[in-house]
């Protein structure tokens, strides 16, 4: 590990709060990279060079400082060790007899901060590479051998069935995203997390059953989140090997989210199992088969027939219940009958024929 300016500044700030003397931190070349006296930055410190070369504490009094042409100020300089190696020097400015009492305390403070920073970097590295592993699983970019090797490294059990959950932030910001990630990665949740974008996060939940998953969704996000902050989409849980299961669960979660945002914008959670048919049909929307299916309905997509198309949608949303549909549309049942007859005339499809009725229904589900 190399001592960087960020860590050096933390050492100076923490040490000077304790001892109220100016503190300098020098890198492995003896150059001052952080100091309580900003005018000394980027200067080569002779005492630090000597401390590094000989791996010892170097005390500089007024006479020695003068001998060195004040390339170093009076003070005491101690090597900073990490894993048995010298990575820099911490120096306390002042007469050695006055500041010597603080030397070991400052050295210990510096080395603790270095160890803490190294641990944070390791955790950051581990998180970043595990996130990359998860994303590769979702996009099916690994062969079986690579998957086994990386799964073993990250203690990722390939035998556990999982379901993909997508979280979409409606007010994305870097702070919001980081706070959410910190919450989701708490060990008590036992789940894997990856960032897709500034406004989307993916969570892998171990699949037990739909009842357990439903209960987990209630605590998926922090308690202070409101429905105005997010949307959640739960993908399919498929009885397949994990390398097939996760990409398909991810795709179904994406399709479920797209469908939910368009057709149920007021809801906060969209579950694949609750919207199975329209989500599975999503792949047909822009295919030649899909175009053929909706071709008879194309006149209904015009602005002048918008009310008829809305009526058709509500009719199927109401499970073909004539009176419930009329109630939802705030019209008389006879008005509804007139509209349904009009739809039959325009499309040439009839509600009392099963194939025609299915075509009409699919036409309300497919994108156009």
Swiss-Prot record:
InterPro entries: CdaR-like_regulators (IPR051448), CdaR_GGDEF (IPR041522), Diacid_rec (IPR008599), PucR_C-HTH_dom (IPR025736), PucR_C-HTH_sf (IPR042070). It holds the Pfam family Diacid_rec. GO terms for molecular function: DNA-binding transcription factor activity. GO terms for biological process: positive regulation of DNA-templated transcription. This is Uncharacterized protein HI_0093. Belongs to the CdaR family.
């Amino acid at each position: 590990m190399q001592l960087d300016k960020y860590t050096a500044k933390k050492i100076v700030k923490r040490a000077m709060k304790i001892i109220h003397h100016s503190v300098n931190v020098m890198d492995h070349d003896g150059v001052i990279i952080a100091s309580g006296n900003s005018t000394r930055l980027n200067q080569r410190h002779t005492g630090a060079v000597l401390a590094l070369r000989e791996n010892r504490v170097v005390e500089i009094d007024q006479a020695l400082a003068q001998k060195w042409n004040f390339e170093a100020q009076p003070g005491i300089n101690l090597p900073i060790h990490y894993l048995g190696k010298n990575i820099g020097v911490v120096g306390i400015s002042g007469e050695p007899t006055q500041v010597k009492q603080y030397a070991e305390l400052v050295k210990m403070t510096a080395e603790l901060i270095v160890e803490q920073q190294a641990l944070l970097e390791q955790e950051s590295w581990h998180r970043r590479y595990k996130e990359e592993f998860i994303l590769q699983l979702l996009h099916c970019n690994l062969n079986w051998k690579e998957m086994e090797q990386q799964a073993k490294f990250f203690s990722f059990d390939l035998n556990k069935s999982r379901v993909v959950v997508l979280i979409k932030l409606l007010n994305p910001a870097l702070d919001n995203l980081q706070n959410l990630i910190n919450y989701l990665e708490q060990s008590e949740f036992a789940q894997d997390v990856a960032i897709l974008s500034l406004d989307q996060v993916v969570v892998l939940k171990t699949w037990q059953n739909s009842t357990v998953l439903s209960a987990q969704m209630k605590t998926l996000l922090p308690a202070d989140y409101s429905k105005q902050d997010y949307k959640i989409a739960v993908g399919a849980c498929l009885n397949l090997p994990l390398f097939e299961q996760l990409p398909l669960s991810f795709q179904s979660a994406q399709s479920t989210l797209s469908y939910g945002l368009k057709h149920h914008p007021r809801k906060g959670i969209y579950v694949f199992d609750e919207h199975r048919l329209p989500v599975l049909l999503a792949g047909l929307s822009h295919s030649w088969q899909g175009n053929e299916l909706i071709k008879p309905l194309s006149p209904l997509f015009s602005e002048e027939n918008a009310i008829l198309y809305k009526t058709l949608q509500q009719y199927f949303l109401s499970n073909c219940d004539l009176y419930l549909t009329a109630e939802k549309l705030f019209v008389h049942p006879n008005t509804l009958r007139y509209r349904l007859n009009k739809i039959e005339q325009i499309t040439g499809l009839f509600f009392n024929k099963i194939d025609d009725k299915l075509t009409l229904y699919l036409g309300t589900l497919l994108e156009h």
